[in-house]
């Protein structure tokens, strides 16, 4: 899925994350800022990467500011930001129903 325009999902509240997606420059670029990066940084990056791969996003700039969100929350925020960037609003395939 191509990122058509900048989009944001989530908040900066505790146990949440804010995900921003923007059109890329030919590659996937991930910028992660997390309050728990030392403990869970690799896992957070893995969840983001797997979600983007499942959505077939290969060219985007993704910025995630994490405040201790669970994996399921991170996944949902990434999905939401990608769908918003494409103005997809109806019949959303949430929770891994894609493919």
What positions do the PLM features span?
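N-terminal intrinsically disordered, cationic/polar leader segments
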Residues: 1-99
């Amino acid at each position: 899925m191509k990122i058509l325009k900048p989009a944001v999902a989530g908040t900066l509240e505790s146990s949440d994350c804010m995900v921003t997606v923007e059109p890329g420059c030919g590659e996937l670029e991930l910028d992660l800022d997390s309050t728990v990066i030392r403990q869970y940084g690799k896992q957070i990056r893995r969840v983001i990467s797997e979600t983007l791969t499942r959505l077939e996003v290969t060219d985007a700039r993704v910025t995630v500011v994490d405040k201790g969100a669970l994996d399921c929350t991170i996944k949902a925020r990434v999905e939401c930001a990608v769908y918003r960037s494409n103005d997809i609003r109806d019949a959303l395939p949430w929770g891994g129903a894609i493919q």
